[in-house]
Amino acid sequence: MSDKLLYTLARPFLFAIDPEAAHNLTLPALRRAAAMGLTSSIVKPAHDPRTVMGITFPNPVGLAAGLDKDGAYIDGLATLGFGSIEVGTVTPRAQPGNPMPRMFRLPKANAIINRMGFNNGGADAFVANVRSSKFYQNKEGVLGLNIGKNADTPIERAVDDYLICLEKVYPYASYVTVNISSPNTKNLRQLQGASELDALLSQLKEAQQRLSDQHKRYVPIALKIAPDMELEQIQTIAQALLRHKMDGVIATNTTVSREAVKGLKYAEETGGLSGAPVFEASNTVIRALKSELGDALPIIGVGGILSGNDAQAKIAAGASLVQLYTGLIYRGPALVKECAAALHA
């Protein structure tokens, strides 16, 4: 049975239950299926290597952070054909996130609203999960580790949390993503301001250089940014990335705008909106970044990819790689192969 047919059969059941409950059923089931060899029939994308941030990605279609916050399902996700897997966001200490319900489907818009709030088991448990994965142990592919700050850490001390996480995850990452753009942690997006960003990037770069010397291995750092910005702020961020010699930028996170989903059930729920409604906003940010960065810094495009054509549009806007999340929920794992085929050089 093809992965497309299997997901077509499973989706009505998954969509009949709470989104977070469906998530909590699907990932353990995938892990068990992978352990039993049941995912071996999934046809993987053609080898289509891209070198980005000094890393060779086997194909340009990655998994975005957020699906596997604790790095507990890496081996199962690795069977779906991604060119990279990004897990997290992880914070220094475990935290429960926001109260439930905190995830809502908007199927008429191919969208999701979430206000999860960086729920995770903390950096030590995260690292233990990563280290125990066969994907990491056997160096099977590209693994991105996404870091954030605890909800109860004052925004003035946010840098401390990022430095703690960077120190812990650095030895195990192919690259590290610094998430300063979730709308679900109070004041987090303030870190995208000019002075706050300068202070953060300066200390991250200093720590990266020290850790590179310590571990005899350079691990690139990418910054994940929001779609809800004016051109001037995007330009300011791009200039800061160049000034501090960062390695990449991921555009974009979820949006707080509700323009595209007005009138739909759950549209007024607080949180970040992902899926089709963020597609154009993300592309606008990517184009603005590309205009500022040129070829000096690579862009990873994420936001609203639900087809191979969508993936092509991200690359046309200026991205070097793409990532999926919400599209997987609506289209299933067949989307990975479809996007990879559309981007095959």
Swiss-Prot record:
Cofactor(s) required for function per UniProt: FMN
EC number: 1.3.5.2
UniProt remark on cofactor binding: Binds 1 FMN per subunit.
InterPro entries per record: Aldolase_TIM, DHO_dehydrogenase, Dihydroorotate_DH_1_2, Dihydroorotate_DH_2, Dihydroorotate_DH_cat, Dihydroorotate_DH_CS
Xref: HAMAP family: DHO_dh_type2
The protein's assembly and partners: Monomer.
Function: Catalyzes the conversion of dihydroorotate to orotate with quinone as electron acceptor.
Record-given protein name: Dihydroorotate dehydrogenase (quinone)
Native source species: Janthinobacterium sp. (strain Marseille) (Minibacterium massiliensis)
Lineage: Bacteria, Pseudomonadati, Pseudomonadota, Betaproteobacteria, Burkholderiales
